[in-house]
Amino acid sequence: MTHPDTEGGQETDLALSASAPLGRYPSPLAAWLGLALLCILMLTAGLNQQIIFLVVEPLKESLSLSDTQIGALGGFALTLVSALAILPLGWLVDRVNRLRLLAACIAIWSASTVGFALAQSFEGLFGFAMGIAVGEAVLGPIMYSLIADMFPRDKWVRANLIMYIAGRLGGFASLAFAGTIIGFAGSGDSVLPPLIAQLDPWRIALIISTLTAPVLIILTLMIRLRSGATVKAQTGGTSQGLFIYFRANARALVGVFLGFGIVFAANGGAAAWFPAALQRGFGAKPTEIGVTMGIIGGCAAAFGVAAAALLERWLRRKVGDLTPMVMAQFATAGTILATPVMLLAPDLTAIYTLYAAKTFLLTVCLSLSPAVLQMLAPSHLRGRVIAVGGLITIIFSSMAPLTVGVLSDTAFHGPKGLMASIVVVSTGRL
């Protein structure tokens, strides 16, 4: 296996590197400010999809959609299209200016979100959802590649952990924020222009979620990277070098990709339906669900990250580099036990308690996965290696929302039929 080596502020990739060492890293202040902006982008990118998941019921009613069609939006348009886009985008991450590529993708997903909000048919929703997926597919490969161009190797784990925490907490914050936006859009007291104010609340909420895009694009182009990083990205390793790397490290990569990918897909894919299940089974409102899940999930994720850090330190002395996989195995076992119990939950309090437990366990399981991929991949292949990992996760994830929708339409009926479908899909994949 090849590993980057840092000495004197420069990085040299062993065996596979065909490029000269890069120059100095940006100042610590510039690097941490850049990381802060990347964290904000993670939150913003997830906001539109969180709103879509929260407004499934009014969206269905507005356009007379079935659960299968909603599942197709989440499974195929938003997820499978990401799988088709992530490898070409991962290749671009290693070949073009990474900051310009990220700025272009912000513009794509923002414009597509507005198009989704204004769509009048399932076909229109599907097409613009594909645009959202393409724009956001670049985030995984590019974020962790940029971290390696902003921080020296001895800071990677810390920066990765902060990015992971931001991604997890940002996801729950965006869920709570999405609920707040939906409440504002439906209040009737909005100060929006009449042309927008007359739209359905779910459409208004999606449009509001894109308002920060121009500022974020400008700030993205101002991120400082180490000197020469852009040049190296434009002259990255060949496809032959990528195949050689995968063949030499196949056993380790298969374990990492499949292990973390299946765990994420089993829970993340089916979880897209969770807000709708609470609306049908317990009569909860989208605003209440978004805020409550955001707060509970954020707290559970924070405790999960803290527990993961403590466990990692203790386990590493015993099992060494196998630590992330051992942690994932135990956390997955706990998730398997917690998921079916949701069918027995008598009220929202019990559901939210189980949701907190699952979120805690998933955070423990997945919190170290970015650092594992980053350390496995040499610099000039990093974007594509991370993209392959993302591709495998997305392939596993893509069928979950559609499968839940089909089961809800055909096999499980009644107020808790959707929750039963979620449990079957989540537990079956684990």
Where are these regions (language model features)?
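Juxtamembrane intracellular "pre-TM" segments in multi-pass secondary transporters
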Residues: 17-28, 225-256, 281
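Cytoplasmic helix-loop-helix junction between adjacent transmembrane helices
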Residues: 128-167
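Helix-breaking motifs and short loop linkers at transmembrane-helix boundaries and internal kinks
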Residues: 64, 97, 118-123, 152, ...
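Conserved MFS/SLC helix-loop-helix module at the cytosolic interface between two early adjacent transmembrane helices
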Residues: 84-122
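Central cavity-lining transmembrane alpha-helices of secondary-active solute carriers
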Residues: 73-90, 295-308
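Extracytoplasmic gate region of multi-pass secondary transporters
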Residues: 52-53, 249-305, 366, 400-401
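Helix-loop-helix hairpin linking two adjacent transmembrane segments in secondary transporters
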Residues: 163-222
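Structural signature of the two symmetry-related core transmembrane helices
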Residues: 100-115, 322-340
